[in-house]
Amino acid sequence: SHAENLVSYVSSLEMKEVCADLTRFVPGRRLDDDGTVLIRFRGGAKGYISASQIAVGRENDISLEIYGTQGSIEWKHSDPNSLLFRSNGEPLKLYRSGGPGEESASRDHRLPAGHPEGFIEAFSEIYRNFFENIRGGAQPTFPSVLDGVRGMRFLEAVVASSEEGSVWKSLEGGV
């Protein structure tokens, strides 16, 4: 559900259907250790999530790529302070958190530019945003109970799709 939440949060798109292929390669494992999920979003966009515990040398690598009609963005967990932006007919642009003109990207950073934010510190930002929301009624930027329910529906549909031979499963009627 973490990957589903990341895709939904970053893209602001709502998943409509999924088609999954989950595999258990390592003998004795109770859960799948490799999987790919094709996604159809409302509005016509398409995507996929690939997750593997057998991809040698990847060491919990997380990356996100979004392609649109005007360009694309790419972010990698291994270089969390960088965002690559490609626009049709333009040179590649590299944005770094904390850089000039990046105040919105720097809001949740406590260290000056050039210092990577830690994975654990990201959770403190979720809690801070949660309490700010309670105090001031600001628009929430943290996962809600409904996001959790949506994540569970996603997982149920993914497992069912794989068990039934990688058929498309609807997420409609959801949260």
Explain the meaning of each model-derived region.
Residues 3-4, 123-128, 155:
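A general structural signal for well-ordered alpha-helical segments in protein cores
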Residues 149-152:
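C-terminal interaction segments
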Residues 10, 134-135, 161-162:
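Hydrophobic residues in alpha-helical segments
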Residues 1-59, 146:
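Rossmann-like dinucleotide-binding domain that binds NAD(P)(H)
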Residues 17, 36, 41, 70-142, ...:
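C-terminal glycine/acidic-rich active-site capping loop/insertion
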